[in-house]
Amino acid sequence: LGDVYKDSLLPPADWVGALGGRVVRWQPFDHEPIRAAGRQVFGIDALPSHDFSRARQIVSFGADFLETWLSPIENQRGFAEAHGFRNGQMARHVFVAPRMSLTGLNADQWLGVAPGSEALVALAMANLILSERTSAPADANALRSSLSAYTPEMAAQAAGVEAEEIRRLCRHLRGI
């Protein structure tokens, strides 16, 4: 035990193994769905790391990134940099979620939606933004078709908010 203790650079498994135990890791939040999405969309088997420090607009759909989501300390550092005045400007943060949280408290706007409706609001926003673009990418027709059912009215009804709130958020994102 003395040799194990004096070498503080031993990995936990080696240190615990020297004591006759085994390492058990437990994580209260399962990140496998996020990893699976990264594999499917980007071909990368890793958790994302977001650089909030360079953001001008942050819209979070239920991701409580300042409290429990992925790397809260890293996210808090970047958010503080983006949300503090930089060259006379600061990032705007909108939190779309059913409950007020630490992330929501730090938002410039909280859009309180019904639980489980965050994705519908995001899809309605994507539909609205894409349909109002004057110069959409050439291959946007398939995406337009997929999003056409997700109107601000449909999402607003499911989310328990006004459709105009969704439109206003889209206008702000586009800088109108």
What kind of region is each of these model predictions?
Residues L1-I176:
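Cofactor-pocket helix-loop regions in the catalytic cores of large enzyme subunits
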